[in-house]
């Protein structure tokens, strides 16, 4: 008897890779921030946390899209506590504004799920001049975590979850080594993979 999960209704793969008891824990009174929660793994994560009673902040660039997903979830689960807030991890100013609001509005934060990410983008830079994938997937989340860390510590036992991919290892047939001496492709041809 595996508990029903948010994953049972969407396009995501179905294998259950966690202890089923975790999916029935009462999370009432707890608060989570999930980045990139308007689609994919982030949306499934936000929905599952809400189904278990948590208040979930969907931290997304496209707030209207997140609000549409929230409406769909609440139509099916009227007691779900979800809200959308704007967060663009490609802008450190946006990260600072988001964290400032969270710190001002909430007295506790039980979990931060750093899920948002971009992959195989054309060569672009963030608002702050960093290569887009490094800026969004790493630097934006690093700053967000740093700015919410005191709130997370005060809410202990809290958690920080960093979602990643196996592509770091596979690199689509490439050697997979991170070129730390040229992270921003200043001396070599850009490769989105």
Q: Model segments located where?
A:
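Short, Lys/Arg-enriched N-terminal segments with co-localized hydrophobic residues
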Residues: 1-11
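Rossmann-fold NAD(P)H-dependent dehydrogenase/reductase core
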Residues: 11-193
């Amino acid at each position: 008897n595996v508990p029903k999960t948010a994953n049972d209704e969407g396009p995501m793969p179905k294998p259950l890779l966690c202890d089923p008891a975790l999916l029935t824990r009462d999370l009432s009174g707890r608060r989570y921030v999930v980045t990139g929660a308007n689609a994919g793994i982030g949306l499934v994560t936000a929905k599952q946390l809400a189904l278990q009673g948590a208040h979930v902040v969907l931290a997304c660039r496209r707030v209207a899209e997140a609000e549409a997903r929230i409406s769909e979830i609440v139509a099916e689960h009227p007691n779900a506590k979800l809200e959308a807030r704007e967060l663009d991890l490609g802008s450190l100013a946006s990260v600072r504004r988001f964290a400032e609001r969270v710190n001002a509005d909430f007295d506790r934060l039980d979990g931060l799920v750093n899920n948002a990410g971009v992959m195989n983008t054309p060569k672009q830079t963030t608002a702050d001049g960093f290569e887009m994938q490094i800026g969004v997937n790493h630097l934006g989340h690093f700053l967000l975590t740093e700015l919410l860390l005191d709130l997370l510590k005060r809410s202990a036992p809290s958690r920080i979850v960093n979602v990643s991919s196996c592509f770091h290892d596979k690199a689509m047939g490439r050697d997979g080594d991170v070129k730390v001496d040229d992270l921003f492709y200043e001396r070599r041809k850009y490769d989105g993979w």
